[in-house]
Amino acid sequence: MAFDQSGVSMSIPKRGFAVSEYERRLDNIQKLMFESKMDAILLTTQVDIEYYTGFKSQFFQSPTRPWYVLIPSSGKPRAIIPTIGESGMRDTWIEDIQTWTSPNPEDDGVSILLSNIKSLMVNHKSLGVPKTLESTLRMPLEDYETLIKNLPGVEIKDANKIMRRVRFVKSEAEIEKIRHICQITSQGFIDLEGFLRAGESEQENCRRFKQHLLKLGVDDSPY
C-alpha cells in the first residue's frame, strides 16, 4: 500500500488506460499529421510504441530484436513485430498485427515494414520519423538505410515535433497516474534518511532505496 506525506493511504489508480485514451492520442497526432502533410509515422522505441498501443514488454530490454509501429494518416496503428511479442500485442487495442520470426539476420522485418510503408504513401509521399531533440532510432542503421533506399520519392520528415505537442497536453487519466507516482516517490525520499547506512557504498544504499520504492508500489525504478 502507498502512503502520502502525512502517512494517509493513497488511492491507487487503475492500471493501464482505457481504449478511449489511445483513441484520443491517435486522433490528436493524426490531426497534426494532416497539417504536416504526413502519410505515416514510423515508431521504433519502447516509449513511443507503448504510448500509442499500450503494449508493455520486457522484451524491449534486449537489443536483439527491432519493433515497429506505423501510425497511418487515418485508421488505427499497425504493429510489425517479432512473433515473440504477438500474444502481448493482441491484448492491446491494436488489430493489425504482422509478425516475423526474429532474429533473422537476412531480413529482420524490413521487407514487411517496407511493404506497409509503401501501402500508406498515398497522399503526400511523406514518412514521419522522430529525428530531433530527445528522439532515438531503435533499429539497425543498416536496416534503416536499406529502408530509405527502397523508398524513392518518399520525403522523410521529422515527426518528433508534432509527437511532442501531443504529449505536452495531459489527459485527466494521465495526470492521475503522474500524481500517484510522484506521491510514492516523494514518500520514498521522505523515508530515505531512515534506511541509509553509514559506511555502506552508494550502490548498496541505492539498492535499498529501490527496494523501498518497490514496496511502496512502483513498477520499476531503473535509475
Residue locations for each model-derived region?
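A composition/biophysics-driven feature that prefers long, compositionally simple stretches
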Residues: 1-184
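An alpha-helix initiation/capping motif
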Residues: 23, 137, 199-207, 211
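Short alpha-helical functional segments enriched in proximate histidine and acidic residues
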Residues: 32, 36, 188, 195, ...
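Surface-exposed helix-capping loop/turn segments at secondary-structure junctions
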Residues: 39-40, 194-200, 219-221
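Active-site pocket-lining segments that scaffold enzyme catalytic pockets across diverse folds
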Residues: 182-193, 202-205, 209-210
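Acidic, glycine-rich loop-and-beta core segments that form the ion-binding/anion-interacting portion
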Residues: 208-223
